[in-house]
Amino acid sequence: MNVDSTGLDATVLVTGASRGIGKAIALRAAQDGFDVVVHCRNRLNEAESVAEQVRAQGRQARVLAFDIAGREAPAAALTADVEAHGAYYGVVCNAGIARDTAFPAMTGEEWDSVVHTNLDAFYNVLNPLVMPMVRRRKPGRIVTLSSVSGLVGNRGQTNYSAAKPGIIGGTKAQGLELAKPGITLN
């Protein structure tokens, strides 16, 4: 979607945007006319490089660094950013991890890190952002990335395959809750 057709001055947060799919999404958002908040956990140099590439396209960009697996850090960083810059037009929940291991050999840490990063992050990132987006009284967009593993499972990915359907279900439920104020989720 090209932001010029909406008439909005729009900012989009992309989680996990320092490399890979998240980087590509951030750059495409800039190409489409959005300002971008580039999120990373700890790859600050790569995230700043993405932000520079966004700025080179004539858009504004800033970097936020926090671990989406925890509750406090995302809430603090996102609340402060919204207070300083205003509510986002959109959010792309892209960040995630895999720790592939056969279930009998899977450690509790491997289970927890994947579930907290992939599933809990849905809440940790979106909860501080939804009401500011609603209060804008303008359309908004939230996109969550999941995996076919969330529908059919995958050998060696019990933790990953358990987390991904939660994202799908959470997205559908939030889509119903946020439809009336004009915020769509996919």
Which sequence ranges carry the predicted segments?
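Conserved glycine-rich cofactor-binding loop
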Residues: 18-19
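Conserved glycine-rich Rossmann-like NAD(P)H-binding loop of the short-chain dehydrogenase/reductase
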Residues: 34-48
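Substrate-binding pocket helix/loop in short-chain dehydrogenase/reductase
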Residues: 102-103, 107-115
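Active-site loop immediately N-terminal to the catalytic Tyr-X3-Lys motif
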Residues: 104, 152-158, 180-181
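Active-site helix of classical SDR
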Residues: 126, 163, 171
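Alpha-helical segment proximal to the catalytic Tyr-Lys
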Residues: 131, 176-180
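Residue(s) in the substrate-gating loop at a strand-loop-helix junction
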Residues: 147
